[in-house]
Amino acid sequence: MEAHGAKPPSRNTLTAYLGVLERLYLVERLNGWAAPVRATSRVKVKPRYLPCDPSIGVFACGLNERGLLRDASVFSRALKSMALRDLLVYAGTLEPGVEPQVRYYADSDGLEVDFVLLLADGRWAAINVEIGESQVKDSIKRLQRLCKKVRNGGTLGEPAFCAVILASTDRPRRDAATGTFVFSLTTFGA
């Protein structure tokens, strides 16, 4: 990680920089969800950071529209950043005066869910963000795995809903087998 003989910044320096970026509303901290699961897998709770404005990350990577469409990794992160921004805005209307709690879920079994919305009354929702239709089936399976782990934990009920948010789809729908909503980011607040 050393470039031209320079040492990488220390963990304390990086933490301080992230704190400044967070206070300037340039990045959004996303903490891990310490889900009430009864399993041998270890739940990861270390914070992740996403740009508050997805264009910041795209600009930092030096990409234009064409470059973004060719770089699936950056496009996916930008899409997740947009989804988080919208989720925080719309979730804030569910309980006026209460800041919405949005987390991610990851464990040592390799299960990852992009966002978990937690409401003060105990309701929760699991949400994944994907680039395209080809990822929906696997994404729904991951959401269902999380629901099963939480159900087996015994202290939290079923989610209020599960959803897969896509970059684009002409088929917004509810999966018949699981009840999972599938829709595009552009219809998120409609």
Where do the language-model regions lie?
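Accessory nucleic acid-recognition modules appended to NTPase machines
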Residues: 1-123
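Hydrophobic/aromatic beta-strand patches that form the interior of the parallel beta-sheet core
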Residues: 50, 103, 125-127, 163-165, ...
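Switch/connector loops and helix/strand junctions flanking conserved nucleotide-binding motifs
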Residues: 59, 136-138, 171-176
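Arginine/glycine-rich "motif VI" loop of SF2 helicases in the C-terminal RecA-like domain
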Residues: 92-96, 145-158
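Active-site ExK catalytic segment of metal-dependent nucleases
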Residues: 122-135
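Short glycine-/polar-rich loops that comprise or flank the Walker A/P-loop
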Residues: 122-124, 157-161
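Mg2+/Mn2+-dependent nuclease catalytic core
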Residues: 132-152
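Domain-level recognition of nuclease-like catalytic cores that cleave nucleotide substrates
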Residues: 165-190
